[in-house]
Structure formats: C-alpha cells, structure tokens
Amino acid sequence: GVPSVSTVNVAQKQHDVNFLLFKVYI
C-alpha cells in the first residue's frame, strides 16, 4: 500500500538523524 504522509515524515526525520550521526562518527 501507499504509506501515509505522517509515516513518510517520521521516516525522513529518522533518516536525517541517522545522517547527522553518520557525519559525527566520520
């Protein structure tokens, strides 16, 4: 099915957090 907008927003925020953590670790 198609994910709801809220689900997409949460996933995007989690991705942003993971990206920031990745930059910190490098």
Swiss-Prot record:
<keyword id="KW-0813">Transport</keyword>
<protein>
    <recommendedName>
        <fullName>Hemocyanin subunit 3</fullName>
    </recommendedName>
</protein>
<keyword id="KW-0561">Oxygen transport</keyword>
<keyword id="KW-0964">Secreted</keyword>
<comment type="function">
    <text>Hemocyanins are copper-containing oxygen carriers occurring freely dissolved in the hemolymph of many mollusks and arthropods.</text>
</comment>
<comment type="similarity">
    <text>Belongs to the tyrosinase family. Hemocyanin subfamily.</text>
</comment>
<keyword id="KW-0186">Copper</keyword>
<dbReference type="GO" id="GO:0005344">
    <property type="term" value="F:oxygen carrier activity"/>
</dbReference>
<dbReference type="GO" id="GO:0005576">
    <property type="term" value="C:extracellular region"/>
</dbReference>
